[in-house]
């Protein structure tokens, strides 16, 4: 799990700079290291619900995988917030958006808000006009089937997956 914490810290430190100035060597190196540590974390604990949904919308509509993940991430974090509260609270402290001693629920909320803000800073939209509502049921079924094998704090169900898809659909 330490690799994941390092990756998150590096992303929050370097992503905006790398996005705004592709020539910023330090930011690009920071993001390369974030990708490395993120990959190491995935190798240790696998992926989860975000990927299960992202694989479906990416495959169906040609949305690049990173963009699909970024589009979906805050919604799945919110869906799993209660079950993952202590880990989300820890990540809030890692990125410096909270103070030790704050309630875990508040810290978890601050971390999810920081993810949303970071996403906005790098031009990732809240919704996609490519995703069609008439496809939601099939996308949800496929995401649920894929997600069953992932070690997640909260399994997807049809209602929650349909709600997440609705939140990202124009």
Predicted stretch roles:
Residues 13, 17, 59, 117-120, ...:
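A generic structural signal for well-ordered alpha-helical segments enriched in polar/charged residues
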């Amino acid at each position: 799990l330490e690799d994941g914490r390092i990756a998150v810290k590096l992303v929050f430190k370097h992503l905006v700079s790398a996005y705004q100035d592709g020539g910023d060597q330090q930011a690009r190196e920071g993001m390369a290291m974030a990708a490395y540590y993120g990959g190491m974390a995935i190798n240790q604990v696998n992926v989860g619900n975000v990927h299960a949904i992202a694989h479906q919308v990416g495959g169906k509509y040609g949305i690049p995988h990173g963009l699909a993940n970024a589009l979906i991430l805050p919604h799945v974090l919110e869906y799993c917030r209660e079950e993952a509260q202590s880990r989300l609270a820890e990540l809030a402290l890692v990125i410096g958006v909270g103070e030790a001693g704050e309630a875990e629920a508040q810290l978890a909320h601050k971390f999810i808000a920081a993810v949303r803000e970071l996403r906005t800073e790098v031009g990732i939209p809240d919704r996609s006009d490519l995703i069609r509502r008439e496809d939601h049921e099939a996308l949800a079924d496929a995401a649920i089937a894929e997600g069953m094998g992932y070690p997640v704090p909260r399994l997807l169900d049809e209602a929650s997956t349909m709600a997440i898809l609705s939140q990202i659909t124009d």
